[in-house]
Amino acid sequence: MMKGGMAGLMKQAQQMQEKMAKMQEELANAEVTGQSGGGLVSVVMTGRHDVKRVSIDQSLMSTEEDDKEVLEDLIAAALNDAVRKVEQSSQEKMGGMTAGMQLPPGFKMPF
């Protein structure tokens, strides 16, 4: 009886590992868009945190020093927004996978 129970656990673990690998691949290929300045600056980022595209509204293009600082701040804010969205998406998708596990509060999975 113990032998059958262990085999069942091993099978479940293998199935979960396969599901997690598939989900990690889906997350890595997913894209999110971070924005700032009401959409004047946007950043498209993959689940691997690779930046695919940065879009800057033409109205922000200027040679003024003050405008340069504003643009730099908006780009940083858009990047941070994209990173937060990638992390939130990852937590939401993996949350269903780990729902039955007894994990300590604040525990982060290594992916």
Swiss-Prot record:
NCBIfam families: DNA_YbaB_EbfC. Residues 87-111 are annotated as: Disordered. GO terms for cellular component: bacterial nucleoid; cytosol. It is found in: Cytoplasm, Nucleoid. It comes from Pseudomonas putida (strain W619). Belongs to the YbaB/EbfC family. Keywords: Cytoplasm, DNA-binding. This is Nucleoid-associated protein PputW619_3586. Binds to DNA and alters its conformation. May be involved in regulation of gene expression, nucleoid organization and DNA protection. The keyword Amino-acid biosynthesis does not apply. It comes from the Bacteria. GO terms for molecular function: DNA binding. Coiled coil: none annotated.
